[in-house]
């Protein structure tokens, strides 16, 4: 399959999250990231806009009873920029994680315009 989106990491946050996971979880994350890179219309089950934010999305990963989220945004339409990730343990996404992602997104675009 031909890639229609490029996936990049901003700073080290995603890599630290990824490296801390089991091989099984890493495999599932890789599957979902591959899907996002090759499918034109990604199902909401895997990628959804974060309500109350401007341009912030969450990548959704489920493995058994474990739920993981990775925050990201789009840049120039075809580039997906990954920020922080975490294991979701409650129904509601922790505000601190959203704020961290918003801060990283702002830093990314500010740095890009320099």
Which residues are covered by each model-predicted region?
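Basic, Lys/Arg-enriched alpha-helical interface segments
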Residues: 1-67, 76-80, 88-114
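ATP-dependent carboxylate-activation loops
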Residues: 83
């Amino acid at each position: 399959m031909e890639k229609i989106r490029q996936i990049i990491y901003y700073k080290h946050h995603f890599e630290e999250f990824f490296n801390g996971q089991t091989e099984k979880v890493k495999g599932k994350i890789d599957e979902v990231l591959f899907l996002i890179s090759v499918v034109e219309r990604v199902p909401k089950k895997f990628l959804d806009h974060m309500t109350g934010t401007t341009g912030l999305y969450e990548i959704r990963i489920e493995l058994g009873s474990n739920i993981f989220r990775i925050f990201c945004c789009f840049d120039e339409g075809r580039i997906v920029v990954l920020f922080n990730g975490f294991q979701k343990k409650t129904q509601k996404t922790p505000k601190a994680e959203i704020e961290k992602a918003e801060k990283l997104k702002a830093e990314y675009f500010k740095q890009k315009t320099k």
